[in-house]
Every structure is written in structure tokens, then in C-alpha cells.
Amino acid sequence: MERTAQDQLVLRWQDSAPVDVLEGDAPDAAKAKLVARAVARGTYELPAPAHARPYFFHKDNRDQTVVTVAERVLSLEQGSNFRDLGGYPAANGKTVKWGLLYRSGATPLLSESDRAEIASLGLQQMINLRSSEERQLAPSRITGVPYTAVGYSFGAIMPKGAFTPETGYPAMIDLLDPQLKLLFAALLRRQAPVATNCSAGQDRTGIASAILLSALGVPRAVIVKDYLLSTQYRHPEYEMPAIDPAQFPGNSAAAMFAHYRPADGKPVPSPTPLMTADGTPFLTFALADIEHRWGSMDGYLERQLGVGPAERAQLRKDYLE
């Protein structure tokens, strides 16, 4: 499913057998309304309000099975990389439920329309992975949601100079340990929908999302593909306000983030692909480090985060369908 224009959506599926198409404002087919019957061409176009986020349901006319789909990324006016982790294939032939697990970039410049759209998600928890300095520079405009952050210095990400993915991504495994434990604790309490974010919504959030999807049994190739979507869906101009480093003395992140929206009006740099020159996704450096240090992702989840077989079974019961 994709938005081909602000007011136009297209649904696509591979099976040519007839399906009924239903639409609802929540991921619950029982409450959805029929919009098209016995569509057999594998595609269906329909109008959509610019900022509504409907859910659609394909009901197979042969066996009445239902597949839920939605837009992966929220169509925000001034947000960045805010997307749903639903719909991915997971353990035991199931899929990740839509509308419960979100990932995002920072949200300091949301419009009022954006705030209303995010409020409609019914978030029960936000896990903010940003440093203390980043949160000072760009406070979130999302209100009314329990907000969890763990203070640390931005310098911890680049303690010896320029960030390199080969060393920086493995280092983030330890850096994010407290936040990851809080994320899984919230999910095991069924405190969802939950949104996890950092500044760009790609590096720290990419690692956290990869670990969460791994716990749900999502295949590695799908996890990496989701990670790489950030290049397409980021809008750096909305991740930070215009910053004058002189206004933030002692803030070690101010100079770096000043380029997001330079005070002198220069263009905001475009996102760059999250891979090395030879095509290696940066995320794989973190995943390889986990497997080297703990033997496997399951070993890491159990011994480091306390998410053993029983906890993974509960997560899959609650967040898969």
C-alpha cells in the first residue's frame, strides 16, 4: 500500500483471486466498512484524506482470511521518519500487528495537524533514545503521553572523534542497554502502542527496532530492509529547529546539529544511504557484534535484557497475529 498523492492511495496484492476491500480507522476488521467487493485485478485505487491514516483489510473470497494493511509511514506535515512496524512476517507464520509498535525521528516541529494525528494513535509510552543535549535542543511537541528517557552525554556516541559505523554501531548496544530494558518492560506490561525515537530515527532507533523485531521472530532480511527505509522517509529539516550554538553554551551537540536547519538559511543536507561503499548496511555491524559477544540474538535477549523464552512467547502472543 502506498500514497501516490496526498489524497490518493493504491492497494496492491499478488494473488489474483477476488478479495473484498474493507476500510476502518483502527486495525480491527470487525469494525471496518466494505468499500469494494470481489476485486480480482490485484490492485485497487481509492481517495484518502491527506492526513487520515486508514487501515484496509483484504478478505479472500475463497476462505474468508483477512490481511490487514496500512501506510507504513505517517503522512505528517512537519515530522520525520515516523512509521509503523506492523505487517512484517514474524514467528510461526504470523505477522506483526499494526498500530502498536512505532519508530520515529525527533518531533520538535510538529504542526497542530501532526499532533492531532499522533494523538489519534493512542500512544501509551514513548521511549526517547536521545542524549540529554539533544533533548535540550529539540524538545518533543508530543504531549499527553508517558515519556521515558535515560540521561547520557552526546559525547558518549563519539568519544574519540568522528563516528564510524564499524565501531559506533557496536558501541550503541551498550549505550542503549537501559533504554532497551525499559522498552521491553513496557511491552511486557502491555503498555502499547509505544513509540521509540532518536533524532534521525535511523541509527539508535534502527538498532532498537531491529532487536525488538528479532524478539518477535521477524527474519533478518526483513529487519535490514526496514532499517534502510529511513533514508527514504527522513526529513532532516523537521528533526531539529534552527540552532545557534552560541545560545547553548556547554551543549556538546549544538554545533553538530546546527547543520540540520542552519540559522543562515542554507539548504538542509539530504539523508545519505545507511551503508558502506561496498553496500554493507551499518546495522549489520551491531547485529554481528551481538552474535559475537552473546552467541546469538536469543542469547543476548535472555542474558543481557532478561527477555528469555517465556518473555518472547508473551511478546509474540501480544504483538503478533
What are these regions (language model features)?
Residues 200, 204-205:
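Ser/Thr-glycine-rich phosphate-binding loops at phosphate-binding pockets of nucleotides
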Residues 1-194, 208-321:
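Cys-dependent protein tyrosine phosphatase-like superfamily
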Residues 197:
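Residues at the beta-strand->loop junction immediately N-terminal to the Walker
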